[in-house]
Amino acid sequence: MTINLVPLLLSLITIFTIFNPSALADQSQIRSTTSQWLHFSEDLSQSTIEVSIPTIIAAVLSFFAASISSAGGIGGGGLFLSIMTIIAGLEMKTASSFSAFMVTGVSFANVGCNLFLRNPKSRDKTLIDFDLALTIQPCLLLGVSIGVICNRMFPNWLVLFLFAVFLAWSTMKTCKKGVSYWNLESERAKIKSPRDVDGIEVARSPLLSEEREDVRQRGMIRFPWMKLGVLVIIWLLFFSINLFRGNKYGQGIISIKPCGALYWFLSSLQIPLTIFFTLCIYFSDNVQSNHTSHSNQNSEQETGVGGRQNKLMLPVMALLAGVLGGLFGIGGGMLISPLLLQIGIAPEVTAATCSFMVLFSSSMSAIQYLLLGMEHAGTAAIFALVCFVASLVGLMVVKKVIAKYGRASIIVFAVGIVMALSTVLMTTHGAFNVWNDFVSGRYMGFKLPC
């Protein structure tokens, strides 16, 4: 019973923080100090947006979007971006910064709830698969950087076309995978033992289960602090490169000419870093054995992919997902989750691991936006807290539903719903923008990256 009250207490504390004027004042003071140190105080001239009907509607819709996204372990950036541009009426640049903060809020709540839970198939491991994260994260971050450059070069109509085609295909594959898991759970429920009164003991694979009590009874699980440390080092290295390099407007810790020789040199440093960490992880015996066990566990789902083949495929898949995520401006979580499901990773492990990786990428973007002087940072923080609370609520609801009905497949369906809504909303909004560019006679061809 105590475990169930933890998310509720976190929610109450968060709500108190949102509506506490002194807390907001402290946040403004911190932002002011940081911006003065970085000489970007002029960019924070307007820290909050005036409360209006569209803003309130956007907050309510963001709450529901975060609740659904948290179940699938994806950040929900596609939904947040659409809500902030269509409903709140923000410009795309401002909406992107808001989306980064909101995705960080969702992912932080998700990771906090899943960090010390047990893997349902490996009782001595955490629900978050750190081996998967180590294999995927370097290539995912590199792919995002490449995708951002491609986004500057490609015309809007091409980006929109690629976005619609790829997400429609991914949504279809995800929904099919969800149906497959649903049928598998139904078959397991039919052959359950008669002693299972509630009829869910065989099929249950909860995203949020009563594992913390189980941990107390059986002893602590082996938390991979070393692997977490490696991931933090990777995050810090990529973050430092992006922070020193700055953006295309020349905003950075040091003064660098946008798209100059030093700019591209710092950008290219991400390539050897990615190759180094990927090769080290690939030839790691510890990670290799864990991926082999993954393949053995998922053989009953007919993945047909060996452990070493999985390790070879995952970096390539992560690089592709990162490129597309950076190209579309939605991050890699919505793209990497369907790929992990397709190779047979369990839904609850996929959700927990994806939310962990999304936290790394979204927090990197959010901190860069903040340090480089974003507009309306106060309002963005409030929206992030709203999404944090919504994520906790969504996780509690999913926990109860899975525990009652034994349907972990609802995680897959949640991913499909978010992807379908994002595809429809962003494609529609993008189509109007492309049409406006066409009728106004704007240039619609390829551009230079600078």
Swiss-Prot record:
Q: Does the keyword Membrane apply?
A: yes
- Print the keywords alphabetically: Membrane, Transmembrane, Transmembrane helix, Transport
- Residues that span the membrane, as ranges: 5-25, 48-68, 70-90, 97-117, 130-150, 153-173, 223-243, 261-281, 316-336, 340-360, 378-398, 408-428
The reply to whether Transmembrane figures as a keyword in the UniProt entry is yes
- What coarse category fits the chief subcellular location reported for this protein? membrane
Q: Which GO terms describe its cellular component?
A: membrane
Location of the protein in the cell: Membrane
Membrane topology note = Multi-pass membrane protein
Write down the InterPro entries for this protein, in alphabetical order.
TM_pro_TauE-like
Q: Could you say which protein family the record assigns here?
A: Belongs to the 4-toluene sulfonate uptake permease (TSUP) (TC 2.A.102) family.
Q: Write down what this protein is called.
A: Sulfite exporter TauE/SafE family protein 1
Q: Which organism is it from?
A: Arabidopsis thaliana (Mouse-ear cress)
